[in-house]
Amino acid sequence: LFAFDACKETCTDIPNGKKRIALVIPIRDRWEHLQILLRNLVPLLQSQHLCFLIVLAEQVIFHSTVFSSSLLDRFTLKAPGQPFNKGLLMNAGVIEALNFMPFHCVVFHDVDLIPISSNLSYACPPYPRHLSTQIDKFNFSLPYVGLVGGVLFVPLDQFLRVNGFSNMFWGWGAEDDDFFER
């Protein structure tokens, strides 16, 4: 979890129409991608004077029920070879963000998608909005109707209304298709 000092100041005096957003970034062994994303995304968010919190959600296995920080480091292992559960991580990211600050909108952001335009608004819409509709690897068009993976804005009340993402999908994909259907 992190919020920049300048953003904390912005959070105390939110301009009309601006809302607090939590960005949840599920990650697995893509730390170089994360550095590139943050170098590009944070200045964009700051230039839009948004109040934001970024939550990094990494899948780990706990080998201890003791959760003090020193023991947590010793008894936490990454989950190599374990199937990825992106839906579970995104749900956990929302819960952690709610423990840190109240927010109106959650943005689920894949770590390997970089905004290519400074005109791309990250302000919270009143309805779910798929932001990554033009990805270079898909020749700037969606491969199928209903794709909402990549970068997705969801007002918190609507996310809670559908009970978040399913935790039942292991491996890459399907959690966002299920979310779209609900």
Over which residues does each language-model region extend?
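Active-site machinery of serine-nucleophile hydrolases
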Residues: 46, 52, 132
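Active-site-proximal specificity loops/subdomain of glycosyltransferases
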Residues: 35, 49-103, 138
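Surface-exposed beta-strand-to-loop junctions
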Residues: 15-22, 51-57, 70-75, 155-163
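Short acidic, S/G/P-rich loop/turn micro-motifs used as interaction or catalytic elements
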Residues: 30-32, 63, 113-115
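Conserved short acidic donor-positioning loop in nucleotide-sugar-dependent glycosyltransferases
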Residues: 41, 59-60, 111
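Short, flexible loop/turn elements at secondary-structure junctions
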Residues: 27-29, 61, 77, 135, ...
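Conserved catalytic core of nucleotide-sugar-dependent glycosyltransferases
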Residues: 81, 85-90, 94-109, 113-182
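N-proximal low-complexity "stem/linker" segments adjacent to membrane-targeting elements
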Residues: 1-43, 47, 67
